[in-house]
Structures are given as structure tokens and as C-alpha cells.
């Protein structure tokens, strides 16, 4: 029997890279998608050597307007059947909304929201025909509340949580597993790239990428629509649902600021 195939976006580093190792250990063939071809090729060789799985790499920037369609066309042309889609690619930016570059904020929306939605819509019908596989979307605990000074990023992750929950409900009984992994602060390059490394949020305790990836995979396998990584993050996610919104905004604003 041929192994199932998992496509992982944003696979070259961070949570995506760790998820690639998790799926490879479970015997999945992989399609790894990210911008940096050399890094992908190095990772593919490592996964093939360590886990004996087939790995295909596709260097593409999903922040580009037509990237999802081009990726889908390449998959069809190559005859690759995707059983599990892991939408992990994304980025954030810290700063006042009116001061951050408009083009980069629109790219963030496209990558975090539009590309994720497009790939899910393009790949889902064939999964439904086979009645197996599923989708694992990587969201964030940022999606549970508004985020002053990371306003667009928090909003995109709110979309991911809402979209995934609705999709999981629609596909109940289909044989597909649909989950949203919601990590909190994690030890990746995300904070540095977002300009948030010195914020109070990322000065607090962070989880390791391997732990987050393991929790995400196990939660998806268990059929949980929402997988909050870590007990502390789970309690935070619960708390913001019952605390006054004005208080939550003040706390998040403080966490997203840099210490004096």
C-alpha cells in the first residue's frame, strides 16, 4: 500500500519544519513548500535519510497573488495526490497599523488568509472523494482576541480559527480530520522577523517547536477541531473568553509593547 502524502507549507523552518519531521516519522510521503529551495532540498535529504520517506520540494512564495493556483497546477501536472494539507505558512508584523507598510500588510493577509483558503478549497474535493486525510491549519492563540500593535496579524489568525471550526463542522462524518493548531509564543524566528522579539510577549516563556508540532499532530489525529498547544496557553485562551474585552485589549497592548 502506498503511503499517504502530506503537503506542508512554510516547511523550511520553525513549526513547519518540525511538523515535517513528525509526519515523516509517521510514514507519510511529503511535499514541502517554502520560498528557499536550498533549505528545502537540505531538509528533504535529512528526512529521507532519517525516516526513509519520499520527499518532493516546491519552492514557491505563497504570498504572491497566483501562487496557490500555480502550486495546484504543478501538483496536478506531476500526478501528486495530497491526502493531508498542512497550512503553516504565514508571518506577522509588529507596530502601529498606520505606520506599517501597507503592501506588506496586504501580503500578510494574502498569505495568512487567502492562500490558506485557496489551497484548502483546491485540494479538499479530491480528499472528499477518497474519504480520508484532512487539513491541519496552523493558527495562533493570537486569534482569540484583538491585538493592538499587531492588529492585522491577530485578525488573520482569528479568521483561521473561525474558518477551521466551521469547516470541521461541515465535514463531520466525511472521514476527514480538520483541525486548527493554536500555539502561543514559540521558540522560532517568527518574533525576530515580525519585529517583536523585544516585546513582553516574547520575553515570557516560549514552547519548543518540536513540542508544538507533536501536540498539533496528535490533536489532529484525535479529531480535535481546535488544538491549543500547552496548558498555560489553553488557560489564556479560556480566560479571554470570559474577561471584559477592554481589559483583554489593555493586556495584549502591554504584551505587544517593548519594555522600557
Regions found by a protein language model. Name each.
Residues 12-13:
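Conserved glycine-rich cofactor-binding loop
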Residues 26-43:
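Conserved glycine-rich Rossmann-like NAD(P)H-binding loop of the short-chain dehydrogenase/reductase
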Residues 88-93:
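Conserved NAD(P)H cofactor-binding loop of Rossmann-fold oxidoreductase domains
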Residues 96-98, 104-109:
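Substrate-binding pocket helix/loop in short-chain dehydrogenase/reductase
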Residues 120, 156:
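Active-site helix of classical SDR
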Residues 140:
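Residue(s) in the substrate-gating loop at a strand-loop-helix junction
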Residues 168-235, 246:
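SDR active-site lid
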Amino acid at each position: 500500500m502506498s503511503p499517504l502524502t502530506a503537503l506542508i507549507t512554510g516547511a523550511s523552518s520553525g513549526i513547519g519544519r518540525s511538523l515535517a519531521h513528525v509526519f515523516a516519522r509517521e510514514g507519510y510521503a511529503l511535499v514541502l513548500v517554502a520560498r528557499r529551495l536550498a533549505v528545502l532540498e537540505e531538509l528533504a535529504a535529512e528526512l529521507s535519510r532519517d525516516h526513509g520517506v519520499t520527499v518532493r520540494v516546491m519552492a514557491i512564495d505563497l504570498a504572491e497573488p497566483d501562487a496557490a493556483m500555480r502550486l495546484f497546477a504543478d501538483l496536478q501536472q506531476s500526478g501528486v495526490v495530497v491526502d493531508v494539507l498542512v497550512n503553516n505558512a504565514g508571518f506577522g508584523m509588529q507596530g502601529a497599523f498606520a505606520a506599517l507598510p501597507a503592501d506588506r500588510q496586504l501580503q500578510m493577509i494574502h498569505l495568512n488568509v487567502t492562500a490558506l483558503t485557496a489551497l484548502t478549497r483546491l485540494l479538499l474535493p479530491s480528499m472528499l472523494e477518497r474519504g480520508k486525510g484532512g487539513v491541519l491549519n496552523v493558527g495562533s492563540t493570537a486569534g482569540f482576541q484583538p491585538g493592538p500593535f499587531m492588529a492585522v496579524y491577530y485578525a488573520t489568525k482569528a479568521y483561521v480559527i473561525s474558518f477551521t471550526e466551521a469547516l470541521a463542522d461541515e465535514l463531520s462524518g466525511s472521514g476527514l480530520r480538520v483541525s486548527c493548531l493554536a500555539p502561543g509564543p514559540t521558540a522560532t524566528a517568527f518574533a525576530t522577523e515580525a519585529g517583536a522579539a523585544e516585546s513582553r510577549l516574547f520575553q515570557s516563556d516560549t514552547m519548543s517547536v518540536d513540542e508544538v508540532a507533536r501536540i498539533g499532530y496528535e490533536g489532529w489525529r484525535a479529531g480535535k477541531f481546535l488544538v491549543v498547544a500547552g496548558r498555560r496557553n489553553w488557560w489564556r485562551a479560556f480566560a479571554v473568553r470570559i474577561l471584559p474585552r477592554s481589559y483583554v485589549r489593555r493586556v495584549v497592548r502591554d504584551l505587544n509593547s517593548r519594555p522600557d
